[in-house]
Each structure stands twice: as C-alpha cells, then as structure tokens.
Amino acid sequence: MALTLLRHAALAKEYENCYNGWKDLSIDPSRFDDRKVALLRKQKFDLIYSSDLLRCQQTLEMMDIDDYVTDERLREVRFKEEIEGLNFHQVEQLDSFRAAYLETREAWHAYICAESQEAFERRIRSFLSELPQNKEILICSHGGTLQKMMTILGYTKNKIDYLEHIRIDNVI
C-alpha cells in the first residue's frame, strides 16, 4: 500500500502557532494555496480518509474531493482544556507552567495534553492496522497526528506544513 499524508489547509492567522487539538476550527479559504495541492488533484486514490474535524474536511472539499471517509482516530492529540487554543507565550503565563516541563518531550506532553502519548499512538496504530493492502490511500489530518504516523511507519520528519503532502510507499 502507498499512503499520501496531507496536512489540512491553514487556519485564520489568529489560530496559527496555537495548540489546536480537538477544537473544531475552519480553514481560512483566502489562505488556501492551490499550487501546493495541484499534483494531488491529478492523482487517483483508491481510498481517501479524513479527520472528522472541519478543517480537514474543508481542505478536501477545497480540492474538489467529496468522496472520503471520516475517522475520529485521525484527530490531533487532545490538549488539556486550559491549553487548547493558546499559543506558547500564553501557556508560559499560566500559573501551572514550570520551565522544567520543557526539559523532556515526555514532560511537555504530560503537561499540555489530556491524552497520553501511549493512548495517542494506540489510536493511530489502530487506524493504520485497519487500512486495506494494495491500495493508493490519501489521508488528510493534522500536523501532530501525521508526525506520529510517520514515526510509526519509520519515516522521520520534524514538521509538516499546511497543505504539505508526503508519500510513503510500500507500507505494510
């Protein structure tokens, strides 16, 4: 199977660089760059999956794709309620913030996320395990989810930008 991983389109600037997990935000259509997805529009996919959150579905619809399956397992990691929607500077100002949380990825994740790393990974592995073999598959999801998926599949990339897409061949 071949997977093409696509990060959803950009949100309104006010939500950029914020911890936007399960908050159901819309994309900003004025920031949709058709050039970034021009090749994807021409490609034939056997199956297309999307996070159930609006920003992913709107991204596919802006690409004139309306035949896709939503799956909540493709959501971004769930942030704690007091973190959701904040940027890093705002998080630093919280009474609960401690600089020590920045010392390890595990400590930072435990501080900002309501979902453990293990639960997040299990959710994504569960989705991947159910994908049919020998298919061309497009997955539209969120930055953190796609990064975790790439790590699970042995593909390392530190960041995936809005509308960036990465193809991974020979996924077993």
Task: Tell me the role of every PLM-derived stretch.
Residues 120-133:
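A short, acidic, amphipathic alpha-helical segment used as a generic capping/interface helix at domain edges
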Residues 145-157:
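Low-complexity, intrinsically disordered Gly/Pro/Thr-rich segments
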Residues 23-26, 63-123:
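Phosphate-handling substructures
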Residues 154-172:
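Domain-level recognition of soluble alpha/beta enzyme cores
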Residues 3-4, 46, 133-143:
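Generic beta-sheet signal
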